[in-house]
From Swiss-Prot:
Residues 45-64, 88-160, 247-290, 332-391 are annotated as: Disordered. Residues 184-241 bind DNA. One of its GO terms (molecular function) is DNA-binding transcription factor activity. The lineage of its organism: Eukaryota, Viridiplantae, Streptophyta, Embryophyta, Tracheophyta. Residues 130-154, 252-290, 378-391 have a biased composition (Polar residues). It comes from Arabidopsis thaliana (Mouse-ear cress). It comes from the Eukaryota. This is Ethylene-responsive transcription factor ABR1. Induction: By abscisic acid (ABA) and stresses, including cold, drought and salt. Triggered by YY1. The gene is ABR1. Its main location: nucleus.
Amino acid sequence: MCVLKVANQEDNVGKKAESIRDDDHRTLSEIDQWLYLFAAEDDHHRHSFPTQQPPPSSSSSSLISGFSREMEMSAIVSALTHVVAGNVPQHQQGGGEGSGEGTSNSSSSSGQKRRREVEEGGAKAVKAANTLTVDQYFSGGSSTSKVREASSNMSGPGPTYEYTTTATASSETSSFSGDQPRRRYRGVRQRPWGKWAAEIRDPFKAARVWLGTFDNAESAARAYDEAALRFRGNKAKLNFPENVKLVRPASTEAQPVHQTAAQRPTQSRNSGSTTTLLPIRPASNQSVHSQPLMQSYNLSYSEMARQQQQFQQHHQQSLDLYDQMSFPLRFGHTGGSMMQSTSSSSSHSRPLFSPAAVQPPPESASETGYLQDIQWPSDKTSNNYNNSPSS
């Protein structure tokens, strides 16, 4: 019994302490409310004071400051007395409740507006992120004109591939044990409930194309391979490249392209036989705008080559003229045969400035070595050469 009485006493003490705390919190909240109301009235009076009366002069500023302090102290004292007495005016309480309701209404309206914006933004994001299936994408059922243009660009004159699915692949995958790690496929991910989803990224625009949900990963991987062949052609990275066969090569249609020397077939004659070497045309899809650019590039290259050839001819003519003028001055009349030999040897390779001065070497000289049969001048001619003025 004593234990029960002590417990009851402790319970009573705890209840009294809790009631005291509640009273203290209530008094503090009421004091804060009174201070807030009086401060608001004081601010309103202070702001309305300059409009009702002219601004005070500098001499009376100290009096006004003292008066405002006295008003603040009196407001605080009256608020404390009202709180201690428990007399709260009804109109002020109603005003406080009205202000609280106004703030709560404004906060609720702003919260509803924000929630509505979030919901609308989410709906827009869902509409923007809505993906298309492969059939809709390539058939153009619910797709836009851009999708149709992309599909028409993809179905150009390129090589055609056929993707064949084998039954052995599914049997092999079904024979995998649970301990062995599964193979990861490109463009395939597993759903939480066990299904396998496949999707692919469109290279022509920033969008993902939904390929569907499948029972196993291999079926999803094969669906990805078929879509990748449609999108990227021979540049596609496949999960099962062994299932692809080339059905039709790239069509070689006659296009009005200016044929240049680099694109013409070259002929090489080896041991009396003529072999034609045709240029290799890449199988990748080329844009239509590359043809006029290639034409302009070929034209500019041919023009540059022609100008370079003219410059070389002009430079060689000037060198030949310099040789004709300098050799007689150096070697005199004895060096005429050497000048004729050099001019004749150069005439076979390039045109000269004056063709009349060129004489072919004798047949015996070409057979026995013309340069070895040259006779050097005697002492008299060397003395004449030393006495002759230098060029």
